[in-house]
Amino acid sequence: MYKCLRCSKYFQNKRRNSNLEQNIFKKYVWQRQTYTDLASEYGRSTKWVQRTLDKIETKNIVTINRQPVVVVADVTFFSRKNGLIVFREPNLRKNIWWKFVPYERVDIYELGKKHLEKNGFTIQAIVLDGKPGVRHAFTGIPAQMCHFHQKQIIKRYLTSNPKLEASQKLKEITATLTDTNEQIFTEQLIAWYETWKDFLKEKTNNPETNRWCYKHKKLRSAYRSLKTNLPYLFTYQKYPELNIPNTTNSLDGFFNSLKSKINVHRGLSRKRGMKVVVELLKGKKLPK
């Protein structure tokens, strides 16, 4: 703060204040310093720290040259109706589009696709976790189904230790997913079905409704999942020049790191929390 010798008024250096605010904000986000830590460092109150953080304006912009991109896309939720959709370029290790959302719907993915295309980006391939309908938002673009999520789907239907021999065999085939190719995997899946197709057709009577239903519903669902997703399980092998990952691990890992950093600052207001998330989405910038 400066005093004018002529009029005796005090003035603030706005640029200096702005730099100070940015420095405090980056320490708060990237160094995980709390209100108390920052108040102690700057010799001020925690209320002053909070007011300083609230002055910060974050821009939903990431700087990246227009270019063809491979996109890993998914939604994560911090609480009910408080979610975040992110498009990440795994080869660049950058988040290139995001939006806070209350739910996960196909039209939100379409919004992200249109935004990138409007700004001069070409999506060469998309990696998804297999949620129903999302692939339709990227019609005409090579789509890769995440191997980890496919294995989790099978595990959910068959459990970790299935008792039925048919389930055990199908689980063994699924376990080879990351170490095989489309031809071998397809042949194994067809051979499994030929062996167990009569078993899959077995029905039982429900005495309460007096209706017939399939006896091995979960096993049928597990097989149907593999059969439905088969055209998208080995896309990464068909386009080696694009370096398409076969999992969404790049984005899953970022989400885990994001939530870990946010949890340090529990009790954040929604507005302040969104500022922190946007700063983390844009990438690490250490304070000076």
Annotate each predicted stretch with a short phrase.
Residues 1-82:
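Short, positively charged, Gly/Tyr-enriched micro-motifs
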Residues 10, 141-144, 264:
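Short, surface-exposed beta-strand-loop junctions and turns on beta-sheet-rich folds
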Residues 21, 25, 121-132, 138, ...:
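Acidic/histidine-rich catalytic cores and adjacent linkers
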Residues 21, 33-37, 94-98, 174-178:
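Short acidic, glycine/Ser/Thr-rich loop/turn "cap" segments at secondary-structure junctions
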Residues 42, 119-121, 141:
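A structural signal for short coil/turn segments at secondary-structure junctions
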Residues 48-132, 136, 229, 250:
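RNase H-like nuclease fold core
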Residues 125-171:
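Conserved beta-strand -> loop -> alpha-helix junction used to position metal-binding or nucleic-acid-contacting
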